[in-house]
Amino acid sequence: MTEEHVVLLDEQDKPSGTLEKYAAHTLNTPLHLAFSCWLFNEDGQLLVTRRSLSKKAWPGVWTNSVCGHPQQGETTEEAIIRRCRFELGVEITDLTPVYPHFSYRATDPNGIVENEVCPVFAARATSVLQINSEEVMDYQWSEFKSVWKSLLATPWAFSPWMVMQASDEQARERLLNYCQR
């Protein structure tokens, strides 16, 4: 895979340039565009993944299915499909926005800052997973309500963006409705 960049955003969330992904994620991370996707199987179970220990930010932490950054000239939907294939080796369908205006800023234990405008989507897996171990060290298919209980009981075990997304009542309701259809 070629070197990834992030799309930098101005104060109005409009693209203002690009920066190499690893150079962007520092102690002073500029605002940039990202995405987050919650992937469900045909039984309505949620794929929860554990970030590889080689990840720069939040290594070894459990998170929602897949996250990443659209490249310049790429739609968010195209980026989600690309990262699902790269990280999980999976094809998806029924890509649906569930929290289109989510943004957050969080600092990991090593001081690395995430500062993202990060629309949240749900999607359905249509093929068997083929996990890229450089991205994902573990994974589990779980009932959404069970994951929600775990998020409430042990939020420190999960990525802050996952906790924040699921804590939004409207987004949580949309995810629950999505997994039940």
Swiss-Prot record:
Domain Nudix hydrolase stretches: 30-164
EC number per UniProt: 5.3.3.2
Residues that coordinate or bind Mn(2+): H25, H32, H69, E114, E116
Catalytic activity: isopentenyl diphosphate = dimethylallyl diphosphate
Bound cofactor: record note: Binds 1 Mg(2+) ion per subunit. The magnesium ion binds only when substrate is bound. Binds 1 Mn(2+) ion per subunit.
Pfam families: NUDIX (PF00293)
Coiled-coil region list: none
Segments passing through the bilayer: none
Pathway the protein takes part in: Isoprenoid biosynthesis; dimethylallyl diphosphate biosynthesis; dimethylallyl diphosphate from isopentenyl diphosphate: step 1/1
InterPro entries on file: Idi_bact, IsopentenylPP_isomerase_typ1, NUDIX_hydrolase-like_dom_sf, NUDIX_hydrolase_dom
Any one GO MF annotation of this record: isopentenyl-diphosphate delta-isomerase activity
Residue positions binding Mg(2+): E87
Biological processes, Gene Ontology terms: dimethylallyl diphosphate biosynthetic process; isoprenoid biosynthetic process
Cellular component, GO annotation: cytoplasm
Cofactors that this protein relies on: Mg(2+); Mn(2+)
Subcellular location as annotated: Cytoplasm
Main enzyme class: isomerase
Alphabetized UniProt keyword annotations: Cytoplasm, Isomerase, Isoprene biosynthesis, Magnesium, Manganese, Metal-binding
Residues at the active site: C67, E116
Keyword Cytoplasm (UniProt): yes
Family: Belongs to the IPP isomerase type 1 family.
Subunit structure: Homodimer.
HAMAP family reported in the protein's UniProt record: Idi
Function recorded in the entry: Catalyzes the 1,3-allylic rearrangement of the homoallylic substrate isopentenyl (IPP) to its highly electrophilic allylic isomer, dimethylallyl diphosphate (DMAPP).
Protein name: Isopentenyl-diphosphate Delta-isomerase
Source organism of the structure: Salmonella gallinarum (strain 287/91 / NCTC 13346)
